UniProtKB/Swiss-Prot annotation:
Its main location: cytoplasm. The gene is tsaD. This is tRNA N6-adenosine threonylcarbamoyltransferase. It comes from Prochlorococcus marinus (strain MIT 9303). It is found in: Cytoplasm. It catalyses: L-threonylcarbamoyladenylate + adenosine(37) in tRNA = N(6)-L-threonylcarbamoyladenosine(37) in tRNA + AMP + H(+).
Length: 356
């Protein structure tokens, strides 16, 4: 049974996992995550240098823990995988160097995984994973994209955010409302007691040069600015800030926009399945609204398991196992890391010489 050790250190989560493919089913044998959220909360966001140092401290222990839990020695693995792009360069380097060293020491193939490919693979860890073709709404702190996954697992981006990602907007609005970092869970908790219809907020559009709008693209900067002005106006009027209503109204309009454009894109593409992955896919209002609207339109909705929505190593292992069993080439041990790399150039990560 093909088995991989996977590592993830692209931002503020150190993670290691052991995965196995058993009769065509992905099995997570062991998975560990060391979150840095509390460390970064005092600054209201991720500090790259601090993140890198914490990865260096945490990752060796996580690797040891998953090996012990899996009862697996390195000699029994078929490959090692690590996230190499996109992300914070210093943070990526910790996982990449660790993975490449382990692969070299034990004469194992190394798979440098694109972080977004990992998120796309996270839905395969569900009890009943969808079968392609389908449309993926990848919505996280750094990315908001609509990606068509074809029958041969080919990936084509059909829509994207032109400014802030949805998760980034949650963080910034959370800070505006005086909430703890990260903003997503804090806004969800506060919004539960609020009136989502109290405030009218804009659904950002992206204009085309020749007129009209990009139908599947997103823009959250205008929404963020509208929230800022609304909070300022309420404060200047001497009113107590209705934080729960503000949070609920913001959360609702984000969910509305994501659902409307995802389902429009799926219908236009003739796709009957929509998949949600990424940290924001854990949002309760978004999940409920997508399921409700999808059912009304005859579209099946799948979401990655909650524990695999945020950054984790299991999704990286899932992507690596897909490549391993498909007979794809492994990455060069000379492969470095890149803060940015387009998803449509993922195959370059397996070329020799490597692209970076």
């Amino acid at each position: 049974m093909p088995t991989v050790l996977a590592l993830e250190t692209s931002c503020d989560e150190s993670a290691a996992a052991v995965l196995r493919l058993n009769n065509g089913c992905l099995q997570v044998i062991a998975s560990r995550i060391a979150s840095q959220v509390e460390k970064h909360a005092q600054w209201g966001g991720v500090v790259p240098e601090v993140a890198s140092r914490l990865h260096v401290e945490a990752l060796p222990h996580l690797v040891e823990e998953v090996l012990q839990e899996a009862g697996q020695s390195m000699a029994r693995f078929d490959a090692v995988a690590a996230t190499v792009t996109p992300g914070l360069a210093g943070a990526l380097m910790v996982g990449s160097v660790t993975g490449r060293c382990l692969a070299a020491l034990h004469a194992l193939p190394f798979f440098g995984i694109h972080h977004l490919e990992g998120h796309l693979a996270s839905v395969l860890l569900a009890e009943h994973p969808p079968r392609p073709p389908y449309l993926v709404l990848l919505v996280s702190g750094g990315h908001t994209e609509l990606i068509r996954v074809g029958a041969e697992s080919e990936m084509v981006r059909l829509g994207r955010s032109h400014d802030d990602a949805a998760g980034e907007a949650f963080d910034k609005v959370g800070r505006l409302l005086g909430l703890a970092y990260p903003g997503g869970p804090a806004i969800q908790a506060l919004a539960a007691a609020g009136d989502s219809g109290r405030f009218s907020l804009p659904k950002g559009r992206v204009s085309k040069p020749g007129g009209g709008f990009h139908p599947y693209d997103f823009s959250f900067s205008g929404l963020k600015t509208a929230m800022l002005r609304l909070v300022q106006a309420l404060s200047e009027a001497g009113e107590d800030l209705p934080r729960a209503d503000l949070a609920a109204s913001f959360e609702q309009v984000v969910a509305d926009v994501l659902v409307e454009r995802s389902l429009l894109c799926a219908n236009d593409q003739g796709l009957k399945t929509v998949v949600m992955v990424g940290g924001v896919a854990a949002n309760r209002r978004l999940r409920e609204l997508m399921s409700k609207r999808g059912q009304e339109q005859g579209i099946e909705v799948h979401t990655a398991p909650l524990r695999y929505c945020t950054d984790n190593a299991a999704m990286i292992g899932a992507a690596a196992l897909q490549r391993l069993v498909s007979g794809d080439d492994a990455s060069s041990l000379e492969l470095g890391v890149a803060a940015r790399w387009p998803l449509d150039k993922t195959e370059d990560l397996y070329h020799s010489p490597p692209p970076f």
